[in-house]
């Protein structure tokens, strides 16, 4: 096993720190790092991780590593360490990019890139980042929850601790193979289920069906005959309409003749319209004159009747008025007689005009009826008025239509039946072909199924065997782990407490003994739990060191003693002082031990942290 000694760490402008911070790790077996919260005690472990592996276990982002108070984004890390007989110097400068320099025995052996250099560092340190950080750094949130963890988490940690990942990886590989083969098995079982279902339908396959003969049906002669019958029927309806119209026209002539019968043997009356107009004008003139004379007569009659003045009562002479009245009467009488004569004549003329109008209307109606009848008869041929039997033709049409429909129906039914038969036979042939194919495939699938089932069973046995092997190796390794824990626990608790691991079927139980009495972690005080956890932590590191390729001198205990009393801290310092080739850094806040070297973290006036 190679021995690595990290001797000195120098750094500048990292997080809370200023320039030129120096800490020597190999000078004292135990160093207490003291300071208030937030001053940067844990940062020292972070610097070591970032310098050696370009990552940190606290999950701090790269951009957050730059100094909080420096004007430039730039930091510097420097470490001096040895491996066996070789001396190394590791230097890292980070600005916008990172430059990493590795010097071995005074010779620069850096790679062309930072990535290549870090691969070289990992080979020198003899392990990956996880192994490195478990060896050098333990905090409240790292391995101290091991004893309270779930069974699965505890087992996973122990598998990793005892370097049994190879069995886990082998088991995972076999499980992956088993899953793949199981998928094949499921696929084959699915195929077999389909084949079985197909073969189960063999009894319900049925038989081939026979088609029927499609009857011969020549529709054309019937269709032609139907067309002719429809034409005849249409013609018959037209002739029937012509005959009906002619009858109506004859009837109209007869009605017109009856209306004209009173005027048939009489001379044609004369139109008296002009004479009526003339007599009407004369009557209007005579009536107007008679009315005027009558008004004069009435006036003179009124004057002749007034014989006394209404104002003075004097007797008035009415002779002139009486004479004018008589003259008006003489003038009115012939006008009145002439008016009566004209009125009588006008009455007679109107009567004669009414007779003329009645005659004219009857004569016009008769003439129009005769003309309409004659014109209609002349526009039609004699054949247009021949009577055809429409009912017989309609019966013929219905019979022909039914005969055509029946013929079509028989052909359609036969064709539909044959189409159904063809589809059913196609399905039958497809099922038969499917069954024959399934019978041919069944032997092959059965053979494959047997082989794959056997392979799955073998892998299940192998998985169970690996599980039992891991359990056996864990059980054996846990005894060594248990002895190592109890070695440290006896020192930390003065022999009061002991710890044991018990396998309950497949579960790994943690049992605590207090003065020989069985108890649990939950029943212990916080301080007692801290001592038990510290003993476990030291045992874990010792195991890691024993199974690793290298032994690293540095152990950084970051506030893992928060709940330990003064006596417990003294015991821890004394225990660590006795550990060979181990330089321990204990981060704490208060009590210090006289055997421990003390470094205090302080803050200067500019807000930068520094070591004193």
Curated annotation (Swiss-Prot):
Coiled coil regions, renumbered to chain: 163-193, 288-459
Gene Ontology molecular-function annotations: ATP binding; ATP hydrolysis activity; exonuclease activity
Enzyme Commission (EC) number: 3.1.11.-
Induction entry: Expressed in the early phase of the viral replicative cycle.
GO biological process, one term: DNA replication
Keywords, comma-separated and alphabetical: ATP-binding, Bacterial host gene expression shutoff by virus, Coiled coil, Degradation of host chromosome by virus, DNA replication, Early protein, Exonuclease, Host gene expression shutoff by virus, Host-virus interaction, Hydrolase, Nuclease, Nucleotide-binding, Viral DNA replication
Domain of life from the UniProt record: Viruses
InterPro entries associated with the record: P-loop_NTPase (IPR027417), Rad50/SbcC_AAA (IPR038729)
Annotated positions binding ATP: 35-42
Function: Possible exonuclease that may play a role in viral genome replication, DNA recombination, and host DNA degradation.
Subunit field text: Could consist of two subunits: D13 and D12.
Family, per entry: To phage T4 protein GP46.
Protein name (Swiss-Prot/TrEMBL): Probable exonuclease subunit 2
Organism this protein belongs to: Escherichia phage T5 (Enterobacteria phage T5)
